[in-house]
Amino acid sequence: MRLNLVIVFLLLVCCVFTCLSAFAQLPPPKKDPLIPTQATQGSTGCSTTEASSCAQAAAKILPIVMGASPLEENLRRLTDEVGGRVTGTPEMAKAVEWGVGAFRAAGVDVHAERYTLPVTWSEGDTRLEMLGPVKFPVRLKAEGWSPATPAGGIEANVVDVGFGNEDDFAKAGGVVKGAILLVHSDIGSTWADLFNEYLRPPMIIDRAVREGAAAILWMGARERLLLYRHTNSLAGEIDKIPQAMAAREDAMRLARTIAAYPGKVRVRFHMPNKIGGPIEQENVVGEIRGYEKPDEIVILGAHLDSWELGTGALDNGCNAALVIEAARAIKATGLLPRRTIRFVLFSGEEQGTVGSFEYVKAHRTELDKIRAMITFDAGIGRVTGYSLGGRRDIAAGVREVLKPLESWGANNHTYDASFGTDNFDFLLEGVPTLVANQEEANYLPNYHAASDTMDKVDIRELKLHTALAALTAWGIADRAEPLGKRLTRAELEVLVKETGLGQQLKVLGYWNAWQSGKRGRKP
């Protein structure tokens, strides 16, 4: 069914606005939060009926985290020695070993939990050969979960379809059939631009398949020939059509050549991606058991996997190391929380949050007792607060927990609900979720790129985030009352509608799974 252009445009605007709110630029960065004071000792604690356990915990956690620690060495070993780690590869297996070993060294109980990854994917030798009338090199990388080209590659004309909207396809006409399509992009510089890189492709891919195109070349949104990789199939499945990301300057040169020689630019496209599976994969799970309500759980998580062009330092090695360091710090205080704190390193996030989806399925009987799921997944930009997944009912509790760090400027929360990281399936199951809202810092230029390496990580900033994460998990776990309840399906239906999450689910292809109960709390 052909979508009206106006509806498509409005849908994208709604989705981008919803996603942008998750990373809204709140107050400008504060002065150094550790000067002149480390924590507000006189703060109200985790409950109005008890002493300031959060302030006491903060006073113990801060010197442990900010002092000498294994954080930097743990991150170095993960990024420099293990390197990029695509789920389903030997490097991912090494990353799991790294996580288990680091938790054990921190004195935290740990185990790995298996699940079945239906499909594995890795890139082969991706090449684009210009056959004429002009020849020049085009640097490109396969898009994640793209199918391989046939043996011998695809030989076809390249057709410029602009930004890939309905009008662009209509102007191109019948020449789209059997062609390789070049799709333009604007330069990306904001969180909204990044989310748009995920929101645009599904409809463009559907148009390309419907019109019989052979493959798609996406123009990179970053300058200076920087190569990076996204996935346009967000459900852990091989995509519908071969796709690659071309370096921006090369793609623009290709567009100019097509304009100069209409209908004559011909190429041979080789992309022998390796597709396998199913295969057993693992999430890494550490735990500090609660002393009073051990069956109630607060999860602090981050994804361990990455793409392999760089070494996955900003996305998301630094936050995998953060989770382990937060566990070490809490353990080292000698304090026990009322509830169990579970520390989870998820795999399969880059393939469409597969690992966290499988975790939720495996722990479905526990979901009523999971009091919060906290996750970090945006590099080392200063944390301004949390995205609370549409849950205004938990805001006061979160502010109370973070009151000991009032001067840090990290208690400004948003109420958006969006797809994008491992909170997703917990949110759809009605569990309270907290996703760290962070300033952009150097995340966007290096996201999924060859430049995502450890030298981009500000270790001191990472330590501050670790202290914040540890106190958040501790405070929620040690509250006298739960932070918030698990929402019913009816309540989730309202949340999905009011936050605009439903629009995202439709654009990204999750709507039917949500409606049927395959994804999220069952009707």
Predicted regions and their residues:
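Short helix-loop-beta-strand segments that form the rim/entrance of peptidase-like active sites
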Residues: E73, E81, A329-V354
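N-terminal capping segment at the start of a domain
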Residues: T48-T89, Y115, D125, L227-N232, ...
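Extracellular/luminal Protease-associated
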Residues: T89, V138-P242, T311, N412
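Noncatalytic luminal/extracellular "stalk/propeptide" segments of secretory-pathway proteins
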Residues: P29-E50, C54, R76, D80-I180, ...
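Metal-dependent peptidase/peptidase-like ectodomains
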Residues: M66, P137, A251, K293, ...
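His/Asp/Glu-rich mid-to-C-terminal helical/loop segments that flank catalytic regions of hydrolases
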Residues: R328, L444-G509, A513-P523
